[in-house]
Structure formats: structure tokens, C-alpha cells
Amino acid sequence: MYKIQLLSCIALTLALVANGAPTSSSTGNTMKEVKSLLLDLQLLLEKVKNPENLKLSRMHTFNFYMPKVNATELKHLKCLLEELKLLEEVLDLAPSKNLNTREIKDSMDNIKRIVLELQGSETRFTCEYDDATVKAVEFLNKWITFCQSIYSTMT
């Protein structure tokens, strides 16, 4: 009688592990990645708030889109990634001798790397954006709040 329950439990466990269900060690890694993402977003925000040249001042006029639904899950980070790619194109952050521009590029590269790691193999999510746009500082503040929320639910 207990054999069937035991076999069912084993089968369910194997199915969860095979489908990438979070384990305690992966949760710890996710927390570290979310914390790193949060720090990089905060660093980027500080650089954006204090532009030192005209090229960066264009960032303040750029309109960003936020997800239509309130971002509450890691899959929503795909929306952040898509908007950062657009910003990078607008700023044309090619290799530069300007330290501020290089630091912004490094922060954006770190953010993209971390988001890709957090997403893993999940590629099915499609971002739906709100019609209203926000400026760079508000955009980054909203994603910082998102990361803080995710981090606090994991602790």
C-alpha cells in the first residue's frame, strides 16, 4: 500500500528536479544574483543622476516602457533587458575614453549578464508594455524597487 505512495513521491520529486524546481542551493544563488543586480542598478542610477557630458544627458530625454502588469516575478526581468538594449543603442556606448561612459557600459553589461543568469532557460515569456512611458531615473527606481521586493521575499 505504501509502495504506490512512495513511488508516486519519488516520481514527483524527479519530475520537479528535471523541470528545474528551485532547491535551497539555487535559492541562495538566486538571492546573490538579485542582490548583485540591485547593486548594479543602484550604481547605474547614480551615474544617470549625475551626467558629466552631453552624451549622457540624452539618457534623461529617452522614454522607457514598463511592463503592463506589475513586475513581481523574475521572468519580468526580460522587460528590463529589452529596454536596456534600446538605451544602449540610443547612447551608442561604444568603447570610450570617458570614465563615466565606460562605467555605465560596464554596469549595463553586468545587469544583462545577471538577468540572463536569473532567467536561465526561460524564454517563453513575452513582455507586454504599458502605453505610458517613464524617464530614466523613474525607470531605474522602479526596477530597483522590484529587486528589493524580490530579495525581501526570498529572505
UniProtKB/Swiss-Prot annotation:
Secretion signal span: 1-20
Native source species: Ovis aries (Sheep)
One GO MF term: cytokine activity
Keyword flag Lipid metabolism: no
Family in the record: Belongs to the IL-2 family.
Upper taxonomic lineage: Eukaryota, Metazoa, Chordata, Craniata, Vertebrata
Key words, A-Z: Adaptive immunity, Cytokine, Disulfide bond, Glycoprotein, Growth factor, Immunity, Secreted, Signal
Entry protein name: Interleukin-2
GO CC term (a single one): extracellular space
Gene Ontology biological process terms from the UniProt entry: adaptive immune response; cell surface receptor signaling pathway via STAT; interleukin-2-mediated signaling pathway; leukocyte activation involved in immune response; negative regulation of B cell apoptotic process; positive regulation of activated T cell proliferation; positive regulation of B cell proliferation; positive regulation of immunoglobulin production
Disulfide bonds, paired cysteine numbers: C79-C127
InterPro entries registered for this protein in UniProt: 4_helix_cytokine-like_core (IPR009079), IL-2 (IPR000779), IL-2_CS (IPR030477)
Pfam families in alphabetical order: IL2 (PF00715)
UniProt function note: Cytokine produced by activated CD4-positive helper T-cells and to a lesser extend activated CD8-positive T-cells and natural killer (NK) cells that plays pivotal roles in the immune response and tolerance. Binds to a receptor complex composed of either the high-affinity trimeric IL-2R (IL2RA/CD25, IL2RB/CD122 and IL2RG/CD132) or the low-affinity dimeric IL-2R (IL2RB and IL2RG). Interaction with the receptor leads to oligomerization and conformation changes in the IL-2R subunits resulting in downstream signaling starting with phosphorylation of JAK1 and JAK3.
Entry's localization field: Secreted
Domain of life: Eukaryota
GN (gene name): IL2
Glycosylated residues (UniProt): T23
PROSITE patterns: INTERLEUKIN_2 (PS00424)
Gene3D superfamilies: 1.20.1250.10
